[in-house]
């Protein structure tokens, strides 16, 4: 049997694929745009599933326009066909319907791709302070056991910490330990 050298070369030089599941920030400073910039600087291919179109700039958020789950499912199906992920990076999830869809997607992908790594940056508010999601912290419970690494800032860690009966208000180590007990494999605050 002969192996085509160009086929072999393409397999050996194939870039890892990251799926970014997040919002689109029209100012380019956050969300999908930031993930694409970061991914390209790391020499990986970035595919994106857009959860919301936000209208914002460096001063304020004017509107958040959630994408229907039906469209998210179509985006995921299109990518599953020829661009399966090595990593999924989750950012803005706008509502409970999106969480339910995401949990089902991750369960399916992890069954198909056992080495899949899931990173969650729990975006709840914009850098200008406006709330970006109607999602309650309690709705995240079903997602957290599917997350390999969660990267909350201190404010987000305090919100997640409120889900645990042994709350710790300011100690980042205790907050991280409590978040781990919610099902994540690793926490970076």
Please tell me what each predicted stretch does.
Residues 93, 123-125, 155:
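Active-site beta-loop-alpha junctions enriched in small/polar residues
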Residues 87-89, 119-120, 151, 188:
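Generic enzyme active-site microenvironment
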Residues 1-87, 163, 167-189:
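Small-residue (G/A/S/T)-rich helix-start motifs and N-terminal tracts that mark the onset
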Residues 47-51, 117-121, 143-155:
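Non-cysteine beta-strand/loop elements that form the S-adenosyl-L-methionine
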Residues 130-189:
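Conserved phosphate/ATP/ADP-binding segment of small-molecule kinases
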Residues 117, 121-132:
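Rossmann-like NAD(P)(H) cofactor-binding subdomain of soluble oxidoreductases
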Residues 89-99:
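N-terminal glycine-rich "phosphate-gripper" loop used for MgATP/nucleotide binding
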Residues 109-118, 182-185:
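A short helix->loop->beta-strand "cap" motif at the edges of active sites that frequently abuts
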